[in-house]
Amino acid sequence: MSERKLFTSESVSEGHPDKIADQISDAILDAILAKDPEAHVAAETAVYTGSVHVFGEISTNAYVDINRVVRDTIAEIGYTNTEYGFSAETVGVHPSLVEQSPDIAQGVNEALEVRGNADQDPLDLIGAGDQGLMFGFAVDETEELMPLPIALSHKLVRRLAELRKSGEISYLRPDAKSQVTVEYDENDRPVRVDTVVISTQHDPEATNEQIHQDVIDKVIKEVIPSSYLDDKAKFFINPTGRFVIGGPQGDSGLTGRKIIVDTYGGYSRHGGGAFSGKDATKVDRSASYAARYIAKNIVAAGLAKKAEVQLAYAIGVAQPVSVRIDTFGTGTVAESQLEKAARQIFDLRPAGIIQMLDLKRPIYRQTSAYGHMGRTDIDLPWERLDKVDALKEAVK
């Protein structure tokens, strides 16, 4: 009998406490970048019952009403009812933002490559905001070149949010989680969905029977293609039996605690750095986007069925210290050729990435829920396939 394997990924809704924090951090970043594209921002957020704390380091001359940004973001998510224990108009907002360390700023503003060098390349000016390693990934399992488990998990919670905001399911509240287990065949191809777990916050009047039927009919069967569902598929919907208390009233939330949800659902490696609240000089964010950009174009070019790109940096240095590409035996050319081509085609210095992907714009709030990678509902520059021809030509 052929060997089959299971792989599981999860996602969370925009009303999950950690995602509320991510969205507030990125909303603050966007508000600052809209007025000062050169700003350096590292905004962290903590949320819990009735309270929001915003803290971190910022270098900018722009004025932003942090209190208003926080309240508007919470309202957009759907926390507008005091019964939820966390409401846009009544929550306490406590900002504590200070200027970026001058020791860090000197390495970011003047990279090692240009110090004392009169013949400067402008793209060498910005050094990496920290040391670290970042990964990008792509696989041909879905149209968006993402692993199927995380792609489906995101779509399930996005569908819940659509039904809640449209009023089609009136008893839904903002907090929700999804988890999808996919069965793979001996060729590592997805063949069926084995298990779906959905926990969704609800009004106290809603019955378990009503929630169960609505989630199956209006969420699971609307999102997951019927070809992946059979009579053996298992559905666990609100398996605790009750989910009325949720959001920050049920759990505290913090920026950067959903890094696997933000990326590939555990299917690929992760360097450990979070994204939200950070401007593009922070390579945790910008280099992760660049790595996804490389990986996606490699797979779209037919040079591999699966590709993982690792980039690594030293603080205050512009050029990456390493570029590594792994195609897991699916490549049509040598990995060394792909690495050479990536260095030729993609400028991987922080300033090069910022220019290549136009990252000084206020585009980040939209990425802070439902994944930073593989998005088909919004136009993100690192999801474009405009380097396919160049890669094909480079490896001839």
Swiss-Prot record:
It comes from the Bacteria. Pathway: Amino-acid biosynthesis; S-adenosyl-L-methionine biosynthesis; S-adenosyl-L-methionine from L-methionine: step 1/1. ATP binds at H16, D175, A176, K177, R242, F243, D251, R257, K258, A274, K278. It is found in: Cytoplasm. GO terms for biological process: one-carbon metabolic process; S-adenosylmethionine biosynthetic process. It holds the Pfam family S-AdoMet_synt_M. CDD domains: S-AdoMet_synt. Residues 100-110 are annotated as: Flexible loop. One of its GO terms (molecular function) is methionine adenosyltransferase activity. L-methionine binds at E57, Q100, D251, K282. It catalyses: L-methionine + ATP + H2O = S-adenosyl-L-methionine + phosphate + diphosphate. Catalyzes the formation of S-adenosylmethionine (AdoMet) from methionine and ATP. The overall synthetic reaction is composed of two sequential steps, AdoMet formation and the subsequent tripolyphosphate hydrolysis which occurs prior to release of AdoMet from the enzyme. Belongs to the AdoMet synthase family. This is S-adenosylmethionine synthase. The lineage of its organism: Bacteria, Bacillati, Bacillota, Bacilli, Lactobacillales.
